[in-house]
C-alpha cells in the first residue's frame, strides 16, 4: 500500500511545531512514547460493545484485560469504589452523567461559562443547555473566586436536581465539602468535573473531590498526561435515589445507571486502543516520578503567575493554586483583545488561547483575556527559571503586537530555547 505522504507530511509539520514552540494552553500536554504506542496498536481493530465480561461481540477476552487494568488503576489513584473508562472525552462523560441523573427539562446548576465554566456545564449551544434547564453561579467580582454564599442562594431558590463543580478557566482550589453541604440542603446530586486539576489531585497536591461528590468526571489528557478521553468515578456506589428498578424489580445502583448512560446511552463501541493508553498513563501516575512532575507543574504555574503580576499583568483571583491562570489584559493593555494577543503570541511560537474573563464586556470571539497553563512545558523539563523568561517574552510580544520584527526576534529566541527540551523529558 502506498504511503499517504500528504497526511504524514502534515503530521511531521505538527511535530515540528510542537518541538519548536512553547506550549502554554492549559488543557494540553505531551504523552510518553508508551502511551503513544498503545494508541497506535492493533487494539484499534477490535469492536467491544459492552463491558469486561459482558460484551456483545466475541473475541473480547484480551481487551477485557486491558480495560479492567485501566479501571483498577484509576480506582487506586483516586480511591474510588467504581469507575468507567469508556467515555471518548470529558464532554461525553458529562453527557452520560446528565443522561443518568436528569430527565429532559430538569434543572441543574453550573459555573457561569463567562466566569470560567465549561460548555458542557450548561451552555445554550451545548446539549447540556439545550435538553436540560441550566442555572448558574458566579465568581465574586472583588475576589475572582467562586462565591459559595451566592451558590447556596441560587441552589435554595432554584432547587436544581444536580449541582456541578469544576470549570475550564478557574485557577483556585474548590471547596468540595461546602458544595456537598449545599447539594444536600436541596437534595441535589453533586457532580464534580475535575478535568483540569485531576493530575494535581492524583498527586495529593489538591483536595480529592471523590471524597465528597456523588459523581466525579475527568478528562484523561491535561494534567493526567494520558490520551484524549474521559472517565467517570464514584467514591461510593449507592442505590439511585429516584427508585429506578431492574426488570426483576430491584432498585438499580447508580453505577448501573451510569454504565447504561455511557453505553448504549451516548456511545457505541469503546475505543480499546485509547483505553489501553489510559491504562498505561494511569500506571505512570502511580509511579513516584509523577508526583515530582505534578509538584513542578504547580511550582511553575505559581512562578509564572507572579512573574506576570510583577510585570503589571492582572491575574484573575490574584494567583493560582493549580496548573493554570487567567490573565485579564484590560488593566495593562485596555485596547488589546484576547484574540489579537493570542494571534501575536502564536506568531512568536508561544501557544495560548483567548479566554473570556469574569464580567467581560467583549464577546467570546474577542475576549479580554488569555488562559495560560504549565502542564505541557513542565513535561518538557521546564523549571522556574524558564517561567521568568516566558513572562518576559509574553510582555515583549503583547507590547508589540503589530511589530513583526520584534515578534520574529522573540520567535527565534523561543525556537533556540526549546532546542534544549525534548517533548517528553524522562
UniProtKB/Swiss-Prot annotation:
It holds the Pfam family SHMT. It is an enzyme of class 2 (transferase). One of its GO terms (cellular component) is cytoplasm. The keyword Transferase applies. It is found in: Cytoplasm. Its EC number is 2.1.2.1. Pathway: One-carbon metabolism; tetrahydrofolate interconversion; Amino-acid biosynthesis; glycine biosynthesis; glycine from L-serine: step 1/1. Its cofactor is pyridoxal 5'-phosphate. GO terms for biological process: glycine biosynthetic process from serine; tetrahydrofolate interconversion; tetrahydrofolate metabolic process. Keywords: Amino-acid biosynthesis, Cytoplasm, One-carbon metabolism, Pyridoxal phosphate, Transferase. Its main location: cytoplasm. (6S)-5,6,7,8-tetrahydrofolate binds at residues 113, 117-119, 363-365. The modification N6-(pyridoxal phosphate)lysine is found at residue 222. One of its GO terms (molecular function) is glycine hydroxymethyltransferase activity. It catalyses: (6R)-5,10-methylene-5,6,7,8-tetrahydrofolate + glycine + H2O = (6S)-5,6,7,8-tetrahydrofolate + L-serine. SUPFAM superfamilies: PLP-dependent transferases. The keyword Metal-binding does not apply. The record marks 221 as: Plays an important role in substrate specificity. InterPro entries: PyrdxlP-dep_Trfase, PyrdxlP-dep_Trfase_major, PyrdxlP-dep_Trfase_small, Ser_HO-MeTrfase, Ser_HO-MeTrfase-like, Ser_HO-MeTrfase_PLP_BS, SHMT-like_dom. Homodimer. Belongs to the SHMT family. Catalyzes the reversible interconversion of serine and glycine with tetrahydrofolate (THF) serving as the one-carbon carrier. This reaction serves as the major source of one-carbon groups required for the biosynthesis of purines, thymidylate, methionine, and other important biomolecules. Also exhibits THF-independent aldolase activity toward beta-hydroxyamino acids, producing glycine and aldehydes, via a retro-aldol mechanism. This is Serine hydroxymethyltransferase. It comes from Bacteroides thetaiotaomicron (strain ATCC 29148 / DSM 2079 / JCM 5827 / CCUG 10774 / NCTC 10582 / VPI-5482 / E50).
Amino acid at each position: 500500500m502506498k504511503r499517504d505522504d500528504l497526511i504524514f507530511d502534515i503530521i511531521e509539520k505538527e511535530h515540528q511545531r510542537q518541538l519548536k514552540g512553547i506550549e502554554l494552553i492549559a488543557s494540553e500536554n505531551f504523552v510518553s512514547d508508551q502511551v503513544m504506542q498503545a494508541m497506535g496498536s492493533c487494539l484499534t481493530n477490535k469492536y467491544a460493545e459492552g463491558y469486561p465480561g459482558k460484551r456483545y461481540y466475541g473475541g473480547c477476552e484480551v481487551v477485557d484485560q486491558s480495560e479492567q487494568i485501566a479501571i483498577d488503576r484509576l480506582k487506586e489513584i483516586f480511591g474510588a469504589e467504581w469507575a468507567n473508562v469508556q467515555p471518548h472525552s470529558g464532554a461525553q462523560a458529562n453527557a452520560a452523567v446528565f443522561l443518568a441523573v436528569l430527565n429532559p427539562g430538569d434543572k441543574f446548576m453550573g459555573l457561569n461559562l463567562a466566569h470560567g465554566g465549561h460548555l458542557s456545564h450548561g451552555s445554550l449551544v451545548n446539549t447540556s443547555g439545550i435538553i436540560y434547564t441550566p442555572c448558574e453561579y458566579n465568581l465574586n467580582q472583588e475576589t475572582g473566586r467562586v462565591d459559595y454564599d451566592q451558590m447556596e442562594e441560587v441552589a435554595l431558590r432554584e432547587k436544581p436536581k444536580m449541582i456541578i463543580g469544576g470549570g475550564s478557566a478557574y485557577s483556585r482550589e474548590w471547596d468540595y465539602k461546602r458544595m456537598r453541604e449545599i447539594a444536600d440542603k436541596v437534595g441535589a446530586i453533586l457532580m464534580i468535573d475535575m478535568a483540569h486539576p485531576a493530575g494535581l489531585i492524583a498527586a495529593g497536591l489538591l483536595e480529592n473531590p471523590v471524597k465528597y461528590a456523588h459523581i466525579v468526571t475527568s478528562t484523561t489528557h491535561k494534567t493526567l498526561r494520558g490520551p484524549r478521553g474521559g472517565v467517570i468515578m464514584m467514591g461510593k456506589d449507592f442505590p439511585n435515589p429516584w427508585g429506578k428498578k431492574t426488570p426483576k424489580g430491584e432498585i438499580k445502583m447508580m453505577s448501573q445507571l451510569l454504565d447504561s448512560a455511557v453505553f448504549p446511552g451516548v456511545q457505541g463501541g469503546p475505543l480499546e486502543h485509547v483505553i489501553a493508553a489510559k491504562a498505561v498513563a494511569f500506571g505512570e501516575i502511580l509511579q513516584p516520578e509523577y508526583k515530582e512532575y505534578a509538584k513542578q507543574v504547580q511550582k511553575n504555574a505559581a512562578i509564572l503567575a507572579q512573574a506576570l503580576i510583577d510585570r503589571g499583568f492582572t491575574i484573575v483571583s490574584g494567583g493560582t493554586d493549580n496548573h493554570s491562570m487567567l490573565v485579564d489584559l484590560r488593566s495593562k493593555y485596555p485596547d488589546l483583545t484576547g484574540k489579537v494577543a493570542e494571534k501575536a503570541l502564536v506568531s512568536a511560537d508561544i501557544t495560548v488561547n483567548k479566554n473570556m474573563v469574569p464580567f467581560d464586556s467583549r464577546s467570546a470571539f474577542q475576549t479580554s483575556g488569555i488562559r495560560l497553563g504549565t502542564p505541557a512545558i513542565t513535561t518538557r523539563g521546564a523549571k522556574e527559571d524558564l517561567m521568568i523568561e516566558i513572562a518576559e517574552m509574553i510582555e515583549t510580544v503583547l507590547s508589540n503586537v503589530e511589530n513583526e520584527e520584534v515578534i520574529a526576534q522573540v520567535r527565534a529566541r523561543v525556537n533556540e530555547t526549546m532546542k534544549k527540551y525534548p517533548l517528553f523529558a524522562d
